[in-house]
């Protein structure tokens, strides 16, 4: 089969990813930056109506947030709204914590798009706790053989600053809750089809 040769060749060229930044110690985390839904890579940061458009998953607006797994947040003693310092060997930024059940353990995610240094007042001159640029801490690690920038090739250290603010978001609680925990939910049990 011709495909066997191609797949074998691809598999032989595979390698483990190379990471740069903070060492592989127990206190370092993987940084996975992602494109902001409306601000993109910051191109639209000067438009206030796009700054105020909520992210479709977190519903955060106007701020740089760091998504952190619930388990990692608990381990670090991080609560929603805590201002975190995210440090790579290149630089550090500050962002507001957003614990999420969707983030893998030992990983943080930060959107591109905020923290611009040039542009309109909507894109610049904002508090570093609310508007930081993840590009400032990305290492310039490249993918072997292609020369492409390894976007998720940076390890970072996260520490609490001792400050906390409210996250500018539209959602309430994203956690799944068992029905029947609150006394007011008992009515749901009484009107269930099997009880009718």
Residue ranges and their predicted role:
Residues 1-196:
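A cross-kingdom feature strongest in bacterial/archaeal respiratory oxidoreductases
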């Amino acid at each position: 089969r011709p495909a066997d040769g191609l797949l074998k060749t691809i598999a032989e060229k595979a390698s483990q990813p190379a990471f740069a930044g903070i060492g592989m110690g127990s206190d370092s985390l993987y940084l996975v930056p992602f494109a902001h839904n409306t601000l993109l890579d910051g191109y639209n940061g000067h438009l206030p109506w796009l700054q105020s458009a909520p992210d479709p998953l977190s519903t955060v607006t106007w701020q740089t947030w760091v998504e952190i797994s619930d388990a990692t947040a608990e381990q670090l003693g991080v609560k929603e709204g805590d201002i975190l310092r995210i440090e790579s060997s290149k630089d550090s930024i500050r962002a507001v914590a957003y614990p999420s059940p969707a983030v893998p353990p030992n990983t943080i995610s930060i959107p591109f798009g905020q923290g611009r240094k040039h542009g309109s007042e909507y894109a610049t001159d904002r508090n570093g706790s609310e508007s930081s640029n993840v590009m400032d801490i990305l290492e310039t690690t490249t993918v072997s053989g292609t020369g492409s920038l390894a976007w998720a090739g940076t390890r970072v250290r996260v520490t609490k600053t001792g400050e906390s603010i409210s996250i500018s978001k539209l959602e309430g609680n994203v956690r799944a809750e068992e029905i029947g925990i609150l006394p007011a939910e008992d009515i749901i049990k009484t009107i269930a089809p099997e009880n009718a």
